[in-house]
Amino acid sequence: MNKNKYILLGAVVLGLGLTSCSDFLNVDRYFRDQQSTERIFSDKDYTLQWLSFCYSRLQGDNLEVGHSDVCPFNFSDDQVFNERGDRFAKFKRGEYLNSTGGQNAWKWSYDGIYQASILLNELYENEDLTPEEVTDVRGQARFLRAYFYWLLLRKFGPIPILPPEGADYTKSYDELAYPRKTYDECVAFITSELEIAATELFEKRDNLNIARPTKGAALAVRAKVFLYAASPLVNGNTEMADFINKDGQQLIPQEYNEEKWAKAAAAARDMIEYSETSGLYKLYTFERRPVSTDEAYPTTIEPPYHEEYSNKPFPEGWSNIDPFESYRSLFNGDIYAAENPELIFTRGTNGDSNDLKTDNTMVDFVKHQLPGTFGGYNVHGMTLKQSEAYAMADGTSFDKECYTLWKGKFTNDENKDEHKYDNVKNGVWWGYTNREPRFYASVAFNGAQWNALSIKEEGGKDSRNKQIWYYRGATDGRINGSDNWCITGIGIMKYVNPNDCAKWGGSIYQKVEPTLRYADILLMYAEALNNISEGTHYQVTSWDGSQTYDIFRDKEQMRRGVKPVRMRAGVPDYSDEVYENPKKFFEKIVHERQIEFFAETQRYYDLRRWKIVEEHEGEQIYGCNTLMNEEYKDMFYLPVRVAELQTSFSRKQYFWPISFDELKRNNNLSQAPGWQNYD
């Protein structure tokens, strides 16, 4: 692009850190002067303002973790929302072709791609930035451009790839009408850009810059892109033979290629090797707490004794860690993002944590989960299926016969010794006792204790450390004529800090979006290896060419990926029989990801890439019987279909549709299969 070409700089503030997110999101403030790119990219402030505009396009409909307004795909078969009428049912029926929810992702992503491309083509030196800083800024722009393409590819399927210099806005619509590239072409471009970005980006960020990517983030996203490319949805999927361009070009590979799994495994191995060598990334763990400091921070509960794991320190066992706190603290804001070695990439808080009215923030996400007692909306619920998926304390599966066997059995002072693997209070149904630590860090079951320690006003202090009930007639139970109640009778505790409260002078702790975690890399590695045929070896060069990996279905390497995640959770590793059997191992990985990444948007896309979504999202949603009051509490826990949450799945819902407005602008764009085209 000509350096003397004048462009309008849509500027936002410089900050990308946690303390300035409210300013960062104020994208309505524009820098009105028209300035040449030469002047802009020779000035540090203007350059960083330009880059900040690119970051702003990661917000809104491009968020990956949030409440239903911006992240409806954070609600698969695991969690639901009960607000604003039939929005959930419409989403589940795929009635969102030309609705505003989620459709801005296309435009916002290409805005970010275009602006990042201009920066990459114009910024080579800057009088106020050191050469190292210039390289890092270029790396950030390159990462963002690749990440926007990745978000588009995952959601919409194959997408147009603009020229590296960016589209020339002076051209007519017809001249800018690019068709979709094939899925493999998209993957090749995105991964190659991430490899370059990995050589440009800084390795570490402080807490004020935590929302900026690092070398590790580039390598991790690269692994994620390769994993999706190897998955059944886009690897030899003949059911997508009709996903074509207008000239008839097929966009989804029709022949299965096992080597793609080897590439995915090698890419994950790249990140694992880099993490271990640099010491920058690992699973977060919290040391054993020998003495309770507060009711909200209890003494460590040791998992049931296991001869192999109970006496070994992490990662070979759990003797020196608190599995419950290790998982809970990952998400609830008790540790600074920059001090969390598991967090590879995050958007930060996505808003101002001090303003409880701010939309699209992690704080607002939590407010949707909080009971009305504590000033929350009380509209996010967990499905019965998800609550049943959590194991018992010893790692065995939850037995659905318990609904009959334990009918009428509740905790009390006399049976405390029978449920020593939890901190459940009295009056709680027995099915919620003796469960694995991740259950108690994630599930707000009926009778769970909410701490709300930040309450300051005298009128609310008695509500600290309070049990919340969802029985009909209870303060937070079913309310006729209102949306503000937990429709499944099972709430969500994940992301909630013991201090969180939205009334009585309380506040909700600042917390960051867990966009990409090291646990994901480990489980991706194991999954990819599992899909390689027994006895087959692939030689794959590392991302930087420094070594060659011998990739095969190596059970010990698969264990290297799974075991640390299980040890951190306080549950036993899989048996040798599971590691030996690819089908059984896949079933375990599906389950492990369902639990480990609950409410992180992973489930929605995992089910699709595995091509098992129809059997999961197509089934009816069950919950507790919220029509029952406390007098009939034994009936509350008998599973019932939640009639208000109608759901279905059709083939078209594998990918999102392109809106009519975008199809009008680009005559060369084809619509995703099953969706109405614009003629």
Task: For each feature predicted by the language model, list its residue ranges.
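Extended amphipathic alpha-helical segments enriched in small hydrophobics
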Residues: 146, 222-223, 510-572
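Long, intrinsically disordered, low-complexity segments
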Residues: 21, 109, 189, 265, ...
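Membrane-proximal, proline-rich intrinsically disordered regions
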Residues: 21-69, 419, 430-433, 663-679
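Conserved, well-structured interaction surfaces
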Residues: 43-62, 82-156, 173-215, 428, ...
